[in-house]
Amino acid sequence: MDHRAFIAGLTASQRAGLTEKSNAKGLAGLALHFGLIVLVGGLIAVGVPGWQFLMMVQGILIIFLFTLLHETIHRTAFHSPLLNDRVARLCGFLIVVPSDWFRYFHYAHHRHTQDPDNDPELAGGKPDTVWEYLVHISGLPTWWSEWKTLFENASGRCETSFVPVNGRDRVRREAVVSLLLYGFLALVSIVSGLHLLLYVWVIPSLLGQPFLRLYLLAEHGRCPFVANMLENSRTTYTNALVRKLAWNMPYHAEHHSYPTVPFHKLPDLHSLIKEHLNSTSDGYTAFHADYLTNLRDVSSKS
């Protein structure tokens, strides 16, 4: 069974229940995620013992706002479209992934999942050697790509196929405003001599990015280049803490099969679809152990 046949087999009441959005559940998740960021940031700011270690915790919390950004650009985090768009813009700003541009990018990824010629997530390929793997999870290529894209968009040189011509002015304005705000915050920090943002935002984000790279690689890494979402996307079985941090996106095959299902309904969808999943892993450690074993320069020595 492929994902289309599965969705076609759902009853009208099942579809209605699975796609029901909730401001309350979204706001509860938002309050928890940002509440932890403010709490940990406050502990770093006052210099509690071990505050240096807390920068990594802060970084993981901040960089995993990517998963909330992802949920909001689908407009499934909240029932309110305006709330989705405002939160998306905030999350995108904090992690240097502008929300309007990312919506175009991500929708192209959904239309062409695991299509080597059209899926923008496959641009540049996946790591195939130990060195490529280490560089990938460092997050450095990601930061380079994000800042490069931001400057290209701001200059009006956004010519990627997934951004429609009538959307390019919007993407450009978003990039210009973002760069102006980043510049303003940097200037205020330098002039005032206060380095708070460096320790509660910038350095933590650098420390947190590798954890997001490790997480995201499991979503489609080593999945086949086919159209069936039950094969080309991976569900990773993990603990409740990771699912909460990632807004239930470890249920990734479920999300790709039925993208209009909000994060809080994905466990329900999983219970219905789990017997048909073809790409799963028993945790992120298991996934990466298998991935490393099958890297080209590792497997050739076995």
Question: Where are the regions that the model predicts?
Answer:
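Juxtamembrane helix-capping/reentrant segments at transmembrane boundaries
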Residues: 77-96, 117-132, 227-242
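Transmembrane alpha-helical segments that serve as helix-helix packing and pore/cofactor-lining elements
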Residues: 17-20, 71-79
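Active-site-flanking alpha-helical
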Residues: 40, 73, 77-78, 227, ...
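Non-catalytic, topology-defining segments of multipass membrane proteins
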Residues: 1-61, 93-198, 263-302
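Histidine-centered catalytic micro-motifs
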Residues: 65-75, 102-114, 215-222, 245-261
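C-terminal membrane-associated helical module and adjoining short loops/tails
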Residues: 162-221, 233-240, 247-249
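Transmembrane alpha-helical segments that form the membrane-embedded catalytic/substrate-channel core
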Residues: 59-72, 98-101, 143-149, 201-227
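Membrane-embedded alpha-helical segments that form the functional core of polytopic membrane enzymes
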Residues: 44-68, 86, 90-100, 205, ...
